[in-house]
């Protein structure tokens, strides 16, 4: 089959199960499956719970779950996640890898030429590659410590299945941290005693009742609360609606501090305070200076609940470095006028103030600093532990702040080996290298094996990685600097991907295995990750398309090759696992929350636990810090950390500081050549790269078939660009095409391209094969083509995607066809 025939076979993807047959539905899906087409089935997703009805064995209708009063329109993209030309239909192997194995020409990796093979052959190739790497290099040669959002469901966690099965074969390099909150989750345990970013926050009803001022600092909950780690309830939108009314009535003052007008600011109609990108720490320091000089800070709270204020003050006042952090000092850097800074300092201590931090602010070079400094401001205000006061780092995520039940949640399929199990290759010799590396530094490790770096008080020695495995995971979305990734991938001997779609990660792999979607298998999930509102039956909507299999089935077959199938499955089938997880949860909730038998639960589709309980974060600590100390070394809030100071890092010292960036807009380093700051935040219409494959839904927001790039009117006018133009965005790291959206929500010097846009490189001749070239143009608009791949600091070594400058221009000539979504060039040999 040639590429033209392959694409022709997928051309009817726009048909979404409204009648007739489709080449996207294999015969077994159209046959009598025993699934009743007259009933609504329940399932869940990161976008919320919903119900579907089938026709001719395919999804025909989708509607919101009964309990979801604020469903996101993303459920309109669900059908396109199942029926689309990007689906991995069969096991496939990169052409040259099939011919030469670990001695293949790795410069061809990414040219998208693949050969269809059987499941048996693909799994044996997978095992053979693992055998070769473990024999020649040991566990340091294999990296399988992935990170990612996976699909919802407690049984079919792609990461758990892969790591359990591969772990039965041998040991491997793992990761620490994640891309979402890497800097925050590392610094905050030193300051507040826990990671905070994934902690439950003060209940929304208490905030609405007690807060006088809410500061949304680099935080856009109205956009980000559309999705959740488990099946999302969207209950937080009810509280945002109440907050909107209180803002309108003048009962609560909400201030959005952000480089752009967020969706939340527009929805609430609240105040907007623009701050130049990456300069928030200067604004915070100036507020602290004003609070100290005007004696606005709460000395009693500082003395009773914190440590290190006396070491911090000399830096703020300038006696330490000769630079007083006054509003006049901060204004030229952050772009906020001195009188506004002074007014803001007074506002923060007038009445009850709740600071709500977003996550994107810590995805920059020195991203630890704004989180630390925000905690210091909250300490100086003195309201930590009071209802409607203090600071939170997660009220934009998974309905944190919705009153939660105390019900036990269902367990999950195990990620690790069971007790007393040993892998076939049981070596733990990592040849002097570290067995765990910071999550965002794996490309560094491939390019510089043996290098020693600092990380969170330890020394990390990069292993010599030869093989990588990705399961339901798309690092060619969430990692930075695509061309640097290409250089690294050319050094690998083997890359294996298990996925639903032909993501860019699959494109740059050697062995690709087709997993079915969430909606083509059964599972069970928590309804509401933090609200813990109930349990959801995730009922199979349709049969798996083509030759795709569930994660459970894929790795059960793989384990069988190892002679460990029964060990892997614990001798239980998919439905037996689901029933076991449910019954264990039922037993744990006995006497507290009523749950029916499994058959009744599965038929009705869910169990609802009822309303949750009100709770205030850090209230116990405030009530008695000796009985309820924080998890810091002192048990107190650490404004100054002696432990961090002892590390001796120049880029993360003993207290929060302003540190210049490698590149920064609005007069900062590099802005003469590349004056625009690129904001690559979470998307409006996806979860990262999930749902970008949904063709009809994607077409509701793309511009000229490309990912939108949002541009200020002034910057657009200067470059002769209007709405709908195709724009080339570029810097020294790469180039991409995107569709222009001119909007006054964005100030001069700022452009936005949402992360999650699928990387679609094409050669200079516009060919798909040429996409393997370093420097290739991304035809669709992946912002990580341009971003900087450096660690935040020696402490967290997290990603710094928001430290990124670009330029843009109107694209001249005929734009190449988008290459992101059409699948591989299938070759017959």
Curated annotation (Swiss-Prot):
The keyword Oxidoreductase applies. Predicted to be exported by the Tat system. The position of the signal peptide cleavage has not been experimentally proven. Keywords: Metal-binding, Molybdenum, Oxidoreductase, Periplasm, Signal. It catalyses: trimethylamine + 2 Fe(III)-[cytochrome c] + H2O = trimethylamine N-oxide + 2 Fe(II)-[cytochrome c] + 3 H(+). Its cofactor is Mo-bis(molybdopterin guanine dinucleotide). GO terms for molecular function: electron transfer activity; molybdenum ion binding; molybdopterin cofactor binding; trimethylamine-N-oxide reductase (cytochrome c) activity. GO terms for cellular component: outer membrane-bounded periplasmic space. Its EC number is 1.7.2.3. Mo-bis(molybdopterin guanine dinucleotide) binds at residue 180. Residues 1-31 form the signal peptide. It is an enzyme of class 1 (oxidoreductase). It is found in: Periplasm. One of its GO terms (biological process) is anaerobic respiration. Binds 1 molybdenum-bis(molybdopterin guanine dinucleotide) (Mo-bis-MGD) cofactor per subunit. Belongs to the prokaryotic molybdopterin-containing oxidoreductase family. Reduces trimethylamine-N-oxide (TMAO) into trimethylamine; an anaerobic reaction coupled to energy-yielding reactions. This is Trimethylamine-N-oxide reductase. It comes from Shewanella oneidensis (strain ATCC 700550 / JCM 31522 / CIP 106686 / LMG 19005 / NCIMB 14063 / MR-1).
């Amino acid at each position: 089959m040639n590429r033209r025939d392959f694409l022709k076979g997928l051309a009817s993807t726009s048909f979404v199960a409204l009648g007739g047959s489709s080449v996207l539905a294999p015969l077994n899906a159209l046959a009598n499956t025993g699934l009743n087409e007259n009933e609504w089935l329940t399932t869940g997703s990161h976008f919320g719970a919903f119900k579907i009805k089938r026709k001719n064995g395919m999804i025909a209708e989708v509607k919101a779950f009964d309990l979801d009063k604020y469903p996101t329109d993303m459920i309109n993209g669900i059908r396109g996640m199942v029926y689309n030309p990007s689906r991995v239909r069969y096991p496939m192997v990169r052409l040259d890898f099939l011919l030469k194995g670990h001695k293949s020409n790795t410069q061809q990796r990414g040219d998208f030429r693949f050969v269809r093979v059987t499941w048996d052959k693909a799994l044996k190739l997978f095992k053979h590659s693992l055998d070769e790497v473990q024999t020649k290099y040991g566990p340091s040669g294999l990296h399988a410590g992935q990170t990612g959002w996976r699909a919802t469901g407690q049984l079919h966690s792609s990461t758990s299945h892969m790591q359990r099965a591969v772990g039965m074969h041998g040991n491997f390099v793992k990761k620490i941290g994640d891309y979402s909150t890497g800097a925050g989750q590392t610094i905050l345990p030193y300051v507040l005693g826990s990671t905070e970013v994934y902690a439950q926050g003060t209940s929304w009803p208490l905030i609405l009742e007690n807060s006088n001022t809410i500061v949304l600092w680099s935080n856009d909950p109205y956009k980000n609360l559309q999705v959740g780690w488990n099946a999302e309830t969207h209950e937080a939108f009810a509280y945002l609606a109440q907050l909107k009314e209180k803002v309108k009535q003048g009962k609560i003052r909400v201030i959005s501090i952000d480089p752009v007008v967020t969706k939340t600011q527009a929805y609430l109609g609240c105040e907007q305070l623009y701050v130049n990108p990456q300069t928030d720490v200067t604004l915070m320091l100036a507020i602290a200076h004003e609070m100290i000089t005007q004696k606005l800070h709460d000395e009693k709270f500082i003395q009773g609940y914190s440590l290190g204020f006396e070491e911090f003050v000399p830096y703020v006042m300038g006696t330490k470095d000769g630079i007083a952090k006054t509003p006049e000092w901060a204004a030229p850097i952050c772009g906020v006028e001195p009188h506004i800074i002074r007014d803001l300092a007074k506002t923060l201590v007038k009445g009850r103030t709740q600071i709500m931090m977003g996550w994107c602010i810590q995805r920059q070079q020195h991203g630890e600093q704004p989180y630390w400094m925000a905690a210091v401001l909250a300490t100086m205000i003195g309201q930590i532990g009071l209802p409607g006061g203090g600071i939170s780092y997660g009220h934009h995520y998974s309905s944190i702040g919705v009153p939660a039940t105390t019900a036990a949640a269902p367990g999950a399929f195990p990620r690790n080996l069971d007790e007393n199990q040993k892998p076939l290759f049981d070596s733990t010799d990592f040849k002097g290298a570290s067995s765990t590396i910071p999550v965002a530094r794996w490309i560094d490790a491939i390019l510089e094996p043996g290098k020693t770096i600092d990380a969170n008080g330890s020394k990390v020695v990069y292993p010599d990685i030869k093989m990588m495995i990705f399961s339901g995971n798309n690092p060619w979305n969430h990692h930075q600097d695509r061309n640097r990734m290409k250089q690294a991938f050319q050094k690998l001997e083997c890359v294996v991907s298990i996925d639903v779609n032909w993501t860019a990660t699959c494109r740059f792999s050697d062995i690709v295995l087709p997993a079915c979607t969430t909606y083509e298998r059964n599972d069970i999930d928590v309804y509401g990750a933090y609200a813990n509102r109930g349990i959801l039956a995730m009922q199979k909507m349709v049969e798996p398309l083509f030759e795709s299999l569930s994660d459970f089935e894929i790795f059960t077959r793989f384990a069988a090759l190892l002679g460990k199938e029964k060990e892997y499955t614990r001798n239980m089938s998919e439905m037996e696992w689901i029933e076991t997880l449910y019954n264990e949860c039922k037993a744990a909730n006995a006497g507290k929350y009523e749950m029916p038998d499994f058959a009744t639960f599965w038929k009705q589709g869910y169990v609802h636990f009822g309303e949750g309980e009100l709770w205030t974060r850090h209230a116990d600590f405030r009530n008695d810090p000796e009985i309820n100390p924080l998890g810091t070394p002192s048990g107190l809030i650490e404004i100054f950390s002696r432990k961090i100071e002892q590390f001796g890092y120049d880029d993360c010292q003993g207290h929060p500081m302003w540190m210049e960036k490698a590149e920064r807009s609005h007069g900062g380093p590099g802005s003469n050549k590349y004056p625009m700051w690129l904001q690559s935040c979470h998307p409006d219409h996806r979860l990262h790269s999930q749902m970008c494959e949904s063709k009809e839904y994607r077409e509701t927001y793309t511009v000229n078939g490309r990912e939108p790039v949002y541009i200020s009117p002034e910057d657009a006018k200067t470059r002769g660009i209007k709405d709908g133009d195709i724009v080339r965005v570029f810097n020294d790291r790469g180039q991409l095409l995107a569709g222009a959206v001119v909007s006054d929500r964005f100030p001069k010097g700022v452009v936005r391209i949402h992360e999650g846009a699928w990387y679609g490189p094409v050669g200079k001749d516009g060919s798909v094969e040429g996409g393997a070239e370093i420097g290739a143009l991304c035809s669709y608009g992946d912002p990580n083509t341009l971003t900087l791949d450096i660690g935040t600091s020696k402490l967290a070594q997290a990603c710094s995607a928001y430290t990124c400058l670009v330029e843009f221009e109107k694209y001249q000539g005929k734009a190449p066809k988008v290459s992101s979504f059409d699948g591989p060039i299938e070759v017959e040999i």
